[in-house]
Amino acid sequence: AKKAADDMAGLLINKESNIEPIPIIYGVRRVGGVRVLVSTRDASGGDPNEYLYICLVLCEGDVHSITDIHLDDIAITNSKYSGLYSFNVHTGSDSQTYDSLLTEANSGWTNTHRLRGVAYIAMRLKWDADVFSGVPEITALVNGRKVYDPRKDSTSAGYDSSLGVSSQRFATPSTWTFSVNPSLCIRDYLSNTRFGKGLAGTKLDDSAFGSAATDCDVTTSFYSGGSASKLFDMNAVLQTDDTLFENVQIMLMGCRGFLPYNQGVYSLRIDKSRSVVYAFTVDNIIGGISITGESKENKFNRINVKFANSAIDYQPDSATWPDAGSTEESTFLAEDGGTLLVSDIELPTCSNYYVARDIARVILRRSRNALRCSIQVTSEALQLSVGDVVTVNHPTPAWGDKPFQVEEITLNYDGTCSLALLEYDSSIYTYDTSAVETTYPD
């Protein structure tokens, strides 16, 4: 838990390096950056080294905007900095030109230093001993990458005319727009050729990604009297020195996503309450059933989630479920013989307390309904997808239409299929309306 908080706090500091990996920002985050240039210039006819020049790289581009710049945790618009700064922001387009401020510095920075594809701040500061004690820490609020939405592309299988936009095109990034929708961000990461997997559009099921995006747009009231808000947003800083698998897992966890791979094509599904799509009985189950019960190692009665909270300017925060002293806590502890079973989870894509709390709740509830089984069935199971809900009716375990969720589908050499199934309870996805409003200091 401490490491998670340290990692999040580390995103707000400035580093100096010419080999530091450049992160990717999806959604909205406050970040520091990497100083790739620190130089000075004498004032004309004045003091030596009076002007300090900084080039602070923030993330991969092209991002939507860079705003609300702070120096040493104080807004740059504060009167204490009046007359002491000039800056330019560059959102990281592939066609951006050089910054004229930086060419003033005694550093060899020229008009060929364009940092195309990189979002950065060019800053000039005038020395004032009453204001600065050294090189200030700079942070900025970044509205991250512009992403493609297949629902807004009239040529896409995922097109949704009800959204009123038809002009986006996957092959034309200038038509893309900023979004915090997890499905669209995951699709962007999978298709990006510079820092992602570089998948062609034909390898992505845009009908599925569009449906998942619509699922992520569903709103709920986080507490009594609260306004409707989305339960799934993506506000993440991904590290490009982490593996593709690690980053995709981070993104999926924040939206309860599955990423099935069928016949060479990736799709996305959001884990939610679903209807049963297929029933398995002795007529299509071949052989016996292998059953694995829940294990104490993976069963919890308390989940702590670490996240960067937008309500406190993206500082590290935590959410816990169930609440201390609650009926749920007492019930779970009684069922577990009074033993506290705790899991600490880092949620890098989340910036909202209520969302973090609800994800903790779903993870905990699933851990307590974690019966698994494996069955061999007839080839009709090939029509299923990971995330589908099925029922199993079989006399051996005395199951009558017991619901399960498909975790894995394997085609066997003899034409049959093997399914890995997880016990399914649709009630766990209903938002916990007992949440109370949390207040934060200004």
Regions found by a protein language model. Give the residues of each.
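Polar, S/T/G-rich
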Residues: A1-C255, N262, A308, Q315, ...
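Surface-exposed, non-catalytic interaction/assembly patches
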Residues: K2-G46, H113, N235, R269-L341, ...
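A general structural signal for short secondary-structure junctions and capping/turn motifs
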Residues: P48, C59-G61, V131, W176, ...
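Conserved structured core elements
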Residues: L52, V63, V180, L184, ...
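Surface-exposed loop/edge segments in extracytoplasmic proteins
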Residues: A75-K80, S275-Y278, Y314-P316, G400-D401
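Hydrophobic residues embedded in beta-strands of well-ordered beta-sheets
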Residues: G264-S267, C417-L419
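Acidic, low-complexity/disordered segments
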Residues: I286, V386-D442
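Long hydrophobic segments that form regular secondary structure
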Residues: A311-N412
